[in-house]
């Protein structure tokens, strides 16, 4: 059977559900797919147990259970990620296995914000999730309107505390379970027949309006991490790699950044699959011929970038998830002064971890396998790093942690 072609008629957005365990994230994910399927036969209804039985995936050497559900509103196409366990959320957000352009925070109206509600908001901030909308679930269990308002106020304060615009974040109160049940009874229910189903439509209207369309990788400034270098007699030096973002044309100037002092050069040729190209775009694996560059001047781990767009750094703060021993991580804790390898884009660089900071701003003496922690790192060579960049921590060739740069310090 021929594969269905992916139609690009609408803007595509990646979103996900976050929030405390048992507040209804997976039920809401199922309800959204069911409600949208009721007005659009191209949307496939996903049942709760299909989403809950999340397949294992590997991202940066870490196994994560995530479910991907696809659906569309009249305005946009969405890929929605839902993780069954709390640890899977932490790992997913730190490795960026499934990027989120926006998150739906699910809070049970019956319980109010709980510890993981707080932790997921903090994580969303630190890994750079740009916007949040809130779904107050299980609203059918609350008879008192004032109680709902109190929970909303509490969540708004929590969002403001972690630098989200708590005052303006959209809130919808509803019941994911009752909406899902109504759709299972009447799969073409549509709008206006059930108040709980209408609440899900209202939520998706908010998501459509409030989450901005992300800038496409191709519209960003050019960057390519160098994977390999070789020289072609009589023509010069070629750097190969995958273009991470932006576009590059023959004749343009690029900077070679990281490991050594930054140098500037001109692109004299581009090749892909042994064919010459006029322009390389985000996602392409290309060979870039560079004018006047010797093979020894450039190595794996450096990046080619638009001049002035990225600078080398060696000191940063990062949010890190440390693998436990079942995940193939360390069996023992580590302490300040630990010097593992930091795998940044295409290369390992040794770094010294000088201090650990807990969520409440205090300092930790040591870090155990399975912990999530903020740490300060100093690399022995400066490399091209920027806020929001992901990396792996390795020791003897195996991954012992995954992190994201939360702040540049030098």
From Swiss-Prot:
Residues 61-65 are annotated as: G2. Its EC number is 3.6.5.3. Residues 137-140 are annotated as: G4. NCBIfam families: EF-Tu, PRK00049.1, PRK12735.1, PRK12736.1, small_GTP. GTP hydrolase that promotes the GTP-dependent binding of aminoacyl-tRNA to the A-site of ribosomes during protein biosynthesis. Belongs to the TRAFAC class translation factor GTPase superfamily. Classic translation factor GTPase family. EF-Tu/EF-1A subfamily. This is Elongation factor Tu, chloroplastic. It comes from Cyanidium caldarium (Red alga). The lineage of its organism: Eukaryota, Rhodophyta, Bangiophyceae, Cyanidiales, Cyanidiaceae.
